[in-house]
Design a protein with these regions (language model features):
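Intrinsically disordered, low-complexity, positively biased terminal segments
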Residues: 2, 8-9, 151-387
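Conserved active-site alpha-helix within GNAT-family acetyltransferase domains
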Residues: 102-106, 112-130, 261-276
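Flexible glycine-/small-residue-enriched beta->alpha junction loops
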Residues: 125-143
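Conserved acetyl-CoA-binding loop-helix of GNAT-fold acetyltransferases
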Residues: 79, 85-98, 234-245
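Short coil/turn motifs at secondary-structure junctions
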Residues: 60-62, 82, 115
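Conserved beta-strand in the GNAT
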Residues: 50-60, 73, 78, 201, ...
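Short amphipathic alpha-helix that is part of the acyltransferase structural core
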Residues: 1-59, 66-73, 140-183, 220-224
Length: 387
């Protein structure tokens, strides 16, 4: 019988071999990941005499409506083919969610290969990004002499602080985002470099930071990729776009990834030759329902009983009675019924109460829907970390 436990350093070679078997990452990226990011204390494995399956929980801090919470990305879920069909993924994910609850985490994040696989565990798509497909011939050259661009060749504390300053300025417009510190930008820089990307920093004539861009000029043949683009004024955006356009002898087009509050289509004059798509990026799942409902109901005059269906975490599979800001587990008949995935999407502001109800995700009378609607609001989120 397989044992579910945390990895030891002695397991590293087997875990890396399974990663390389399961994923198509370049060797340079795998070296970076296991040298710089990997922590056996965050790696759950299923093992008999040999490794069968693996799952990693990489730690982050998520800020939800000014509430800073510890969380973790579930990544690297992998099972050797001869052991698939033995419910090892289920065992690992169930254990990962139990660990998340015991560690006081309120939300679990998951980077999916196939979203359909993970919805059965209560995860739902909650974070999306805009993807702009732009021909370089449609980018106007706007060289601005008041902007100085610097290609970062080595990360320093000073540079990391400037990037954090820009990120936090943009985050003022987001309701949900992952918090970043110096360590994040050091490891982010190394991740970008092993994938042949560059970070460009823009400063004005007063030497103040006004934006940065993460650009991969060789992501695909004849196509570049802008993974991240932040600007604090239009002159920085002009300079970044001119830099991208200067690659016209190398590239035909570029994919530009942007947050939900992007003004890029406006910048391009709503050019109908530019295609824009909304790409689901990251899944999430509530780990602690009581905590979430207490945050949502704080200072509200409300009387509502909500039944949450959660087939994995029994402490969430309850009727929660909300009354005037307090939340308690109750034997009351529920006014509202929904599953953990629907509650997660409502909490994250991904869907509205009316949309969820119309799609049959919520059971409730109209009078109770009106009360429920007071708890949730649309949120602008930004999550763009891969591992």
């Amino acid at each position: 019988m397989s044992e579910i436990r945390y990895a030891l350093y002695d397991d590293l070679k087997e875990i890396r071999n399974l990663w390389e078997y399961s994923f198509s990452d370049e060797e340079s990226f795998v070296d970076y990941y296991f040298d710089k990011r990997y922590n056996p204390g965050c790696n759950l494995i299923a093992k008999e005499t040999a490794l069968l399956a693996s799952l990693q929980r990489n730690p982050y801090k998520i800020n939800i409506s000014k509430d800073s919470q510890n969380t973790a990305y579930v990544v690297g879920i992998s099972v050797y083919p001869e052991h698939r069909g033995k419910k090892l993924t289920t065992k690992l994910l169930n254990k990962a969610l139990e660990e998340a609850y015991n560690l006081g985490e309120k939300i679990s994040l998951l980077m999916p290969i196939d979203t359909a696989i993970y919805r059965r565990y209560g995860y739902e798509n909650c974070f999306s990004l805009y993807s702009f497909e732009v021909n370089l011939s449609d980018i106007e050259y706007k060289n601005n002499k008041s902007v100085n661009l610097e290609r970062i060749t080595k990360m320093t504390d000073e540079l990391a602080d400037l990037l954090i300053e820009i990120y936090l300025e943009k985050a003022k417009n987001w309701d949900i985002y992952l918090e970043r510190d110096r360590n994040h930008y050091y490891t982010y820089f190394e991740e970008i470099k092993v994938e042949a990307g560059e970070i460009f920093l823009a400063k004005n004539n007063a030497n103040e930071p006004i934006g940065y861009m993460v650009f991969y000029p060789k992501m695909e043949p004849s196509k570049g990729y802008v993974r991240e683009l932040f600007y604090l004024d239009s002159s920085a955006l002009d300079s970044f776009m001119t830099l991208v356009a200067s690659h016209k002898t190398q590239l035909d087009s570029v994919t530009i990834q942007q947050p939900l509050d992007s003004q890029l289509m406006y910048y391009f004059g709503f050019n109908n030759k530019i295609s824009v798509s909304l790409k689901p990026f990251m899944m999430a799942r509530i780990v602690d329902v009581k905590y979430v409902l207490e945050k949502l109901a704080k200072d509200m005059i409300l009387d509502l009983s909500i039944k949450i269906n959660d087939g994995i975490l029994s402490q969430n599979n309850q009727v929660f009675h909300i009354k005037n800001g307090s939340v308690a587990i109750s034997d009351n008949k529920a006014d509202v019924v929904m599953d953990i995935g629907t509650l997660t999407q409502l909490y994250m502001g991904t869907v509205s109460v009316s949309s969820a109800y119309d799609l049959g995700k919520i059971e409730a009378e109209n009078i109770n829907l009106a009360q429920l609607n007071r708890l949730f609001s649309y949120k602008i989120s930004y999550v763009n970390e891969y591992i």
